[in-house]
Amino acid sequence: MKFLNYYKNYYTKIFDRIYITEDALSYPESKKAIERLSLPVKEVVSAKDIHKEHLNSKTLFITKRKGAAVKSCPGTRRHICCNYLTVDLYEGCTLGCSYCIMKSYLNFSPVTVYVDSSSPIEEIRKIALNNKDRIVRVGTGEVGDSLQFDPLFEMTADFIQGLANIENLYFEAKTKTCFVDHLLEIKNKGNGVISFSINPEEIVLTEETGAFSLKERLDAAAKVVKAGYNLAFHFDPVICEEGWESRYLDTIEKLSVFPKEKIKWISIGTLRYPPDLKEKIAQTERPYLFDEFVPCADGKYRYLQRRRKEVYRKLYNRLRDITNSSVYFCMESNTVWNYAAGNVPGNLPDTIWLFRAIKG
């Protein structure tokens, strides 16, 4: 891929230095990023050797992963989990969303990139082959945006191509950017899914200030579906400010332009946060903190249950009207599922395939 000046300008506004561990030096992804950025580089043995004053998001840290490459979505106690699998490629994000849960545990951390993609690809293949009787979903957007830094390292293409011949596997790259051009020419896309986290433009402007506009994300979605990819969308978090219903229903209408058969799933999740994140959000005086929230069984604060039921039912019903996609709620209780969707996901034809447990 030709590395455009636009990307170089974008990344050099974010980073001003690179740290790299010795065991990551030989990887082509590392060499490519270092050459493209032309920033000062320091070799270290581990993250512990990064200078204290550089422990922030202006530092790009390139390394090999330690421990398991593929993990289960962490889930939360007494809330239904969709058995999604995750791979950490890019850890950390600079898009600056006010509600981001990563603020509670990555606040003083460099953006970390794990360049050894062959190990997780092989592990994912084994898991999928061990679960031939069910669909396996795996993605890279759990602890960072899947595509924000991908034009620099180009690792998502390795996953898409390396997993393309596995029929029961969906590999998902989730983003709030429009950085998809480097993926469009891949010939064998298999069941690759490019997904977009979306919110009404009013929320984007006030709470996702470093992310890309709703229009830019939807324009990127049009590009990838034209190139042959599957799509997914994530309304997460839904923020219930005044006028929320009309704003979210208007945003849902914008999805009607995409082929129904190409949207594989849509998730909805209302705003939630652990106690330590509340303290960080409070420092910025976000207006949504003045709404009514209650601590739930998993320790996170959520809107009152009666309000969540109302939100989920209205958005769920409208999405069911305009799409054939599987629509599910992220980290919600049986009670909310039964009210908003009429049953729990394991008993609904549209979602049963999403919620089957994955074997080893």
What name fits each language-model region?
Residues 1-83:
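Flexible, acidic/Gly-rich N-terminal and inter-domain linker regions that tether
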Residues 1-26, 256-360:
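Auxiliary Fe-S-binding modules of radical SAM enzymes
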Residues 63-81, 98-197:
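Conserved Radical SAM active-site core
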Residues 87-97:
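Cysteine-centered iron-sulfur cluster-binding motifs in ferredoxin-type domains/subunits
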Residues 124-130, 182-187, 214-227, 315:
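Structured alpha-helical segments in the cores of large, soluble enzyme domains
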Residues 136-140, 171-173, 194-196, 231-235, ...:
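Hydrophobic faces of well-ordered beta-strands that scaffold small-molecule active sites
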Residues 144-147, 178-181, 192-212, 237-241, ...:
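Conserved radical SAM core fold
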Residues 243-258:
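Catalytic cores of alpha/beta
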